[in-house]
């Protein structure tokens, strides 16, 4: 192993040890299930904002999005635009109402529990349904994060993908298992800061060291359709983007209001005042990080010449940020330790999402399934033990799903994001803002949204294509629309909610 690799490795080891230390510290402060799942509702503005955004973006931000732009051009920025709009609406419209409502609805600790309490579901249908949806789709989502970690270690250190996968999974498992929500949020705060610094500095320094004009270098790299088409957000290689393609990318923003690992941050902020600060911090972080990630894909195409990723045995395009850091800090600047720190930023993106997803899945399994259906008299410490056991089980299952080294990070994230967004997004929005929404509507929304995504993405037509591949329309857009329609239809076709339910709604709405 070369001295450069050893220096980079030392940065990784130091970073991973810091994450584990944070887990140990918060393990001593975690004594109940409310501490483990929501940190006692004690998050401050900075931790809430950066942990929410870091857990949201994942390795997709530093690998998936830059890789898509590297391969296909700036037409892929519409995903970033959709996500930014979704982030703003989520923080401005959803966060305050959700925090107030979860407290009013029997101090709900999880999204499934909130939905059950919101509609006073005595038969517990919502709790069971939503917990199952979370476990299924978060398994896929967690697998995408582990796959990104495996590719990172494989590319940087030449470690076998499967060994790299095991290392990443083990570290994430350690601090999530020990410290719960506060450990996850504090590590995500550190990781969100590191991600943003890396995203801003690397493309800027790489651009300043280019050996020619960006346009000429893009042409030399064989950019699809030439430099002009590559830099045109309305072009897809040698042809214009269709309305369906742009709409499908913008539709990613619909997913935010259905993401339990993001929504729980809103529930955990300690005051309305802190939540307002969090909103501004999160929105600024989001626009800076998404813009920088797009520039990584563009500048990376020119900077890495003569290498063209994805061709002649080179790394895949999703490794563009990794390759830029290696070339910039190890070859050009001779600062491998600094490069190692920025590579830790990619690891941070991966870990910040995986830990949050593990925690939400653990809460669904222990609080919503075990406590409510299997052992109703379980005390807080027993629920905590079940949650920690769930973290282990889910980590192992996600590890198995991510076993294939050819797994697409973008593909795995896309499927999980669509499933969660379509199942929960319309239901959460309507439960917060439409007084007439009832239990039947909520159940219909979750079932129809989740099933639509599964049918759209996985059930082949006669020709072997799925509806998604045939139409080019993102399943989240279809699932969200179907779910919303079913909520309205079933709510209006069945009995109106009781006065007891609407009184709580009116109280939260300030009527």
Kindly label every feature range from the protein language model.
Residues 1-511:
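Membrane-embedded helix-loop-helix hairpins and adjacent transmembrane boundary segments
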């Amino acid at each position: 192993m070369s001295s450069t690799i050893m220096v980079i490795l030392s940065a990784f080891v130091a970073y991973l040890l810091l994450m584990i230390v944070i887990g140990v510290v918060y393990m001593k402060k975690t004594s109940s299930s409310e501490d483990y799942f929501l940190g006692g509702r004690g998050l401050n503005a900075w931790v809430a904002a950066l942990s929410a955004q870091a857990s949201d973006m994942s390795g997709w931000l530093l690998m998936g999005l830059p890789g898509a732009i590297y391969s296909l051009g700036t037409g892929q920025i519409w995903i970033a635009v959709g996500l930014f709009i979704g982030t703003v609406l989520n923080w401005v419209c959803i966060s305050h109402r959700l925090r107030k409502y979860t407290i009013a609805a029997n101090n709900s600790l999880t999204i499934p529990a909130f939905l059950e309490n919101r509609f006073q579901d005595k038969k517990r249908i919502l709790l069971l349904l939503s917990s199952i949806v979370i476990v299924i789709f978060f398994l896929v989502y967690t697998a995408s994060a582990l796959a990104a970690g495996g590719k990172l270690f494989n590319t940087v250190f030449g470690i076998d993908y499967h060994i790299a996968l095991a290392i990443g999974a083990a570290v994430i498992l350690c601090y999530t298992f020990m410290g719960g929500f506060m450990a996850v949020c504090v590590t995500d705060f550190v990781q969100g800061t590191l991600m943003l610094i890396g995203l801003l500095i690397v493309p800027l320094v790489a651009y300043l060291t280019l050996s020619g004009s960006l346009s000429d270098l893009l042409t030399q790299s064989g950019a699809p359709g030439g430099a002009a088409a590559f830099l045109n957000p309305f072009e897809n290689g040698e042809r214009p983007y269709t309305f369906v393609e742009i709409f499908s990318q913008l539709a990613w923003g619909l997913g935010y209001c259905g993401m339990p690992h993001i929504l729980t941050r809103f529930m955990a902020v300690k005051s309305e005042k802190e939540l307002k600060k969090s909103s501004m911090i999160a929105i600024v972080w989001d626009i800076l990080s998404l813009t920088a990630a797009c520039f990584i894909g563009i500048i990376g195409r020119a900077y890495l010449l003569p290498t063209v990723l994805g061709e002649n045995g080179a790394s895949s395009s999703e490794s563009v940020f990794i390759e830029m850091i290696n070339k910039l800090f190890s070859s050009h600047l001779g600062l491998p330790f600094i490069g190692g720190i920025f590579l830790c930023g990619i690891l941070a993106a991966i870990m910040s999402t995986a830990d949050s997803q593990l925690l939400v899945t653990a809460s669904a399994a222990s609080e919503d399934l075990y406590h409510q259906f299997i052992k109703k008299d379980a005390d807080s410490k027993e629920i905590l033990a079940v949650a920690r056991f769930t973290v282990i089980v889910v980590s192992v299952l996600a590890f198995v799903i991510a076993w294939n080294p050819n797994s697409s990070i973008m593909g795995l994230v896309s499927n999980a994001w669509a499933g969660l967004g379509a199942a929960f997004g319309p239901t959460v929005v309507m439960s917060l803002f439409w007084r007439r929404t009832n239990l039947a509507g909520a159940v219909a929304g979750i079932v129809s949204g989740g099933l639509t995504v599964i049918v759209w993405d996985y059930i082949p037509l006669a020709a072997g294509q799925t509806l998604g591949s045939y139409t080019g329309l993102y399943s989240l857009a279809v699932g969200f629309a179907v779910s919303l329609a079913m909520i309205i239809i079933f709510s209006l076709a069945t009995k109106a909610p009781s006065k007891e339910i609407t009184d709580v709604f009116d109280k939260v709405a300030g009527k």
